[in-house]
Structure formats: structure tokens, C-alpha cells
């Protein structure tokens, strides 16, 4: 209900959470009959028959990707721009990633998830599983590219340096940054 009532512009995080919420309800409804029949059966650990893709992609996948669309740019913004606030023009958090790539990865990931869930429920032929899987993989690759470009374009660290803790590689003027101890 709060997502519908919100007054701010929808971001990639909001769009993914808007998929997560009904996917979670749908997964619960699909799983309920199996859990009522045999609540401790190992084959029902992750829900009823045909609900695995809905749980893995519709619930967990959209929740994780939506959260990463907020956390990664936020951490970069706090590290790079927060101390400049009020002294110079700084970008908004949502300006750090590419909106077009975010829209593309959302469409690909959603389309792939819908195809996989529909194939699981026998609403589409089994061949749709391959198509759906391909769309999910492509959407995941576009998301990863968007986040890696965000890190590359706005962080003083190289991609490897951010992971392994190397000193910053470049400053705005192209010189190697000095490490503050």
C-alpha cells in the first residue's frame, strides 16, 4: 500500500520492491497447499511444486537487486560526495547509475522470471524455460555492468582496489591519490 501512495519518483529500487511484494504473496499462496498436506516433507522446503523460480527470482532476486540499487550508489555517494555537500554541486544518489541500463535489466529480469514461472505452472511450453533463463542471465549481466560502471565512474578506487583494499588509483586531475592514514 505504501508503494502505491508514495509521492517520490519511482527508482529501480522501488520497481523491484513492487515486484517483490506480490511475488512473495504469490509464492506463499502457491506453497500453502503443499505445506498443509505435508509440512515437513523435504520436497516442500522451498514451497510447493512449481514455485521455486518464483521464490528464487521473484522474491529473493528482486529483493537483492533492488537493495543493491540503493546500497552500492549510497556507499559511493557517502564516500565520494557527502563531504562536498554545501560547498559544490554534487550528484544525487540516483544519478550515479545509468537509468537506461536499470530499465533494461528490469525488463529482462522480469520477462525471464515471468517466463520461468509460467513454464513451471505449465502455462507456457517447456521451451519457454530456456528463453526465460536466457532473459534472466542477460538481465543479470546488464545489472552487473550497470553497478560496475557506477563503481568505475564514481569511485576513486579501481574495481580490484575496491575489493582488495588497494589505494585509490586516480584523482580528478588524473594523479594518483594520496592515502590518508
Segments predicted by a language model, with ranges:
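Hydrophobic alpha-helical transmembrane segments of multi-pass integral membrane proteins
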Residues: 1-181
Amino acid at each position: 500500500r505504501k508503494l502505491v501512495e508514495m509521492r517520490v519518483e519511482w527508482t529501480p529500487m522501488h520497481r523491484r520492491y513492487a515486484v517483490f511484494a506480490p511475488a512473495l504473496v504469490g509464492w506463499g499462496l502457491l506453497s500453502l497447499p503443499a505445506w498443509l498436506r505435508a509440512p515437513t516433507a523435504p520436497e516442500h522446503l522451498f514451497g510447493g511444486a512449481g514455485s521455486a523460480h518464483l521464490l528464487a527470482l521473484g522474491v529473493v532476486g528482486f529483493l537483492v537487486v533492488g537493495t543493491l540499487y540503493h546500497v552500492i550508489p549510497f556507499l559511493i555517494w557517502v564516500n565520494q560526495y557527502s563531504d562536498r555537500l554545501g560547498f559544490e554541486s554534487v550528484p544525487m544518489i540516483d544519478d550515479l547509475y545509468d537509468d537506461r541500463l536499470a530499465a533494461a535489466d528490469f525488463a529482462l529480469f522480469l520477462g525471464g522470471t515471468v517466463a520461468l514461472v509460467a513454464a513451471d505452472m505449465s502455462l507456457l511450453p517447456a521451451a519457454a524455460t530456456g528463453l526465460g533463463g536466457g532473459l534472466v542471465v542477460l538481465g543479470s549481466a546488464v545489472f552487473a555492468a550497470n553497478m560496475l560502471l557506477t563503481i568505475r565512474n564514481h569511485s576513486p578506487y579501481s574495481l580490484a582496489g575496491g575489493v582488495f583494499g588497494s589505494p585509490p588509483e586516480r584523482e580528478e586531475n588524473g594523479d594518483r591519490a594520496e592515502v590518508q592514514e
